[in-house]
């Protein structure tokens, strides 16, 4: 299928498809100057979308797809590889979630302090503009 149909079918823009091609995430066959997207491209784009939902970066996704494609892994090795990738990613996401939770708590405390300040009290938040 052609690039426009592929983009529409997968609910992405043509620019996104081209970006993924430039990064080597999808590898369509080029016939007479036009890209032709096959079932392998369909599978790859579904994998890309799924990994993006899991908050993997495009570079991480490329590493995963490249290793799966070129690594000549048997099923057990493939599972071990992905297990390690997922464990590392889980740890990073848990750390980010903890940091976001702490930041959210601090913002809520500041908001509460601000709201509890007397309304008619002037609060100096910066430089005087006069």
Where are these regions (language model features)?
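Polyanion-binding surface elements
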Residues: 1-14
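Arg/Lys-rich, alpha-helical DNA-contact motif
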Residues: 3, 39-130
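Glycine-centered, phosphate/nucleic-acid-interacting loop/turn motifs that mediate DNA/RNA or nucleotide
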Residues: 24
């Amino acid at each position: 299928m052609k690039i426009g149909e592929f983009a529409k079918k997968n609910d992405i823009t043509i620019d996104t498809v081209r970006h993924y091609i430039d990064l080597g995430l999808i590898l369509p066959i080029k016939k007479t100057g036009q890209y032709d997207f096959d079932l392998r491209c369909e599978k790859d784009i579904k994998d890309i979308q799924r990994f993006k939902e899991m908050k993997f970066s495009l570079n991480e996704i490329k590493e995963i797809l490249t290793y799966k494609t070129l690594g000549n892994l048997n099923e057990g090795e493939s599972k071990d590889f992905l297990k390690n990738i997922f464990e590392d990613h889980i740890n990073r996401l848990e750390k980010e979630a903890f940091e976001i939770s702490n930041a959210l708590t601090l913002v809520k405390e500041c908001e509460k302090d601000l709201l509890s300040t007397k309304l008619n009290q002037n609060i100096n938040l910066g430089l005087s503009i006069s």
